[in-house]
Curated annotation (Swiss-Prot):
Keyword Disulfide bond among record annotations: no
Glycosylation sites recorded in the entry for this protein: 149
Chief place where the protein resides: secreted
Protein name, as recorded: Prosalusin
Organism of this sequence: Mus musculus
Assigned protein family: Belongs to the ClpA/ClpB family. Torsin subfamily.
Gene Ontology molecular-function annotations: ATP binding; ATP hydrolysis activity; hormone activity; identical protein binding
Amino acid sequence: MAVARHGYRPWGSILGLLGLALAAAAAWDVASLRCTFGSFCECDFWPDLPGLECDLAQHLAGQHLAKALVVKSLKAFVQDPAPSKPLVLSLHGWTGTGKSYVSSLLAQHLFRDGLRSPHVHHFSPIIHFPHPSRTEQYKKELKSWVQGNLTACGRSLFLFDEMDKLPPGLMEVLQPFLGPSWVVYGTNYRKAIFIFIRWLLAVWHHGGAPAGRCGALPPAPAASRAPLRTQ
């Protein structure tokens, strides 16, 4: 029986552990340099665009043009170290076309903690803006919330669900944040992402169908059409 004598000469084990330690240190240095010189480590903003593209391909049926446009827009925005304006995505479509699912995937693959990230802000009209009579109060609160959170983290995501149910005029307070200016209210907002979700029926009623034509709805959109607009 052959007896290994490694117990008498532990240098191999020590050198192996030293190699692991050096490799870990090198990996840490690379990550540190990336955080120092890149914009990927702001807050918990860690974009995983290949993972997003994979999940969209595997779990979102149809919507080929929409998927391609989402990925293309995000790549261009994330890779730009100094964007001139925030990324604005408008997702609209019929019920069941994947609007909410796409928005959750975006948060999941853009931030380390996904929708639980303190820098992902999800607004629901039923929860946050239930009383149209308080629109002016909501405007002040929304402006203060967006401004304060962008001051804390420029890489913030603001998700507005069911846009068709929001009090009229509420979104006017966001217009200064969506343009190409450098600073708004003393806040640099150009790295922010805004996502607006709207039901297609509301879009049709607000701008598609002539007034007074009840029931004049468009045919259901084909799966290949992209219910998405970017700014």
